Amino acid sequence: SVRNFVKILESAGVTYGVLSNEQCSGDPANKLGDKLTYQLLMDQNVEELNKVKNVTTMCPHCVVNLQKEYKKYHEIKYEVKHHTQVISELLEEGRININPGSLEKVTYHDPCNLSRTLDEVSAPRNAIKAAAPEFFELDESGKETLCCGAGGALWWKKDSGEGRTHLLRAEQVIESKTDTVVTGCNFCYGMMNQGIGPLTPAGQEEIKVKDVADIVAENLS
């Protein structure tokens, strides 16, 4: 996914750099109650990121923290965008061209932080629809999306698996008869893969899980 996002940026002629001293945003530590670790990571990140003007990340959790949470404690001098917003802008500006070559049925799982916390539901759809004419919505979508099961640091909580949210969402995706499910969050990407694999009936082809950057990069013209 990261390589495909880089492919998109380079296709558009975007000048970019990668942080040499990148740290986690601290979101998992914060959600798990480790406020000291969160504070340390936040302080380091703000010092580093205030040296630049524009920041792009592929993780909605990171956007929420870098853009919203850090402002409660620091003066923020940079602007943060989710990678789907960048891709959508590049499309609108005509800086990338997409050949809608995917004839598969494609649906989209809205990440909670992107759709509800950041109020972003259009950008990923603009990008997906440009590449996949056979796009359709899941029953619970947009701001009414069903959590993938990794939110609130639950990615690190292990249990028997019975009744877990990611299995409920995976069942919905499988029942939709889609060929591919696309998302815009690394946590959602992982949970989709964990849920869909075990629940796919024997003899049925497993639904592919992709990031928005993947489906766009695959169809660049």
What is the meaning of each model-derived region?
Residues 1-221:
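Iron-sulfur cluster-binding electron-transfer modules in prokaryotic oxidoreductases
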